[in-house]
Amino acid sequence: SILDIPDEVALTVIAIPAPWVLDVLQQQAHKRIRHAIIISAGFREKGAEGIEMEERIRRVAIENDMRILGPNCLGVLDNYTNFTTSFLSWERVSIPKKGSLSILSQSGAFAIALLDLAAQEGLGIAKMINYGNRIDVGESDLLPFLRDDVHTKVIAIYMESVDYGRRFIEAAKSCSKKKPIVALKVGRGAAGIAAAKSHTGAIAGNYALYKAAFLKSGIIEAHG
């Protein structure tokens, strides 16, 4: 278990069945490990029981000053350090060359497809962050991080929903003054909203509100 590791640990990557995740995080809290990426799926997107598991995890995180990416995600790819937390087979998904585009995506499938397309088209990637169900860390945290990242010059976001409306607008406004942000908002119609809810448990919301938020914060909206 984590408790048997003698050294200090900066980050855990958790990829075990969903019902066991809470126990691992409680062990992590005991060792005062402050950061976790939860790859495991089977939470909010599965209904009421999954929502309750997420709430318990969130309480552990708050009580122990812990930051969590995920669950139901691939995690991160840093193309400049070759650090990745995903379990992708790079024999099946091409690795893009180093570049200046960073990707934020709620959808793991879209992130994989975009990485593969970028490699085929010769488009350079700096970082990819897939945050899935967004139990804690979301767009409002990640945009300031990419704003200050020396390798990132352009930011692309694939968005099903947003974490905190006002915080997101302020973060995007600050970021877009330094680097262009291009966002693809899915779930604009009834079918898209249903797909987002079944995929990451996200409530896609009123598209008109997103459109207004993009205009206010300087985000360039993509259509496709």
Give residue spans per PLM region.
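Catalytic-core regions of core metabolic enzymes
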Residues: 1-224
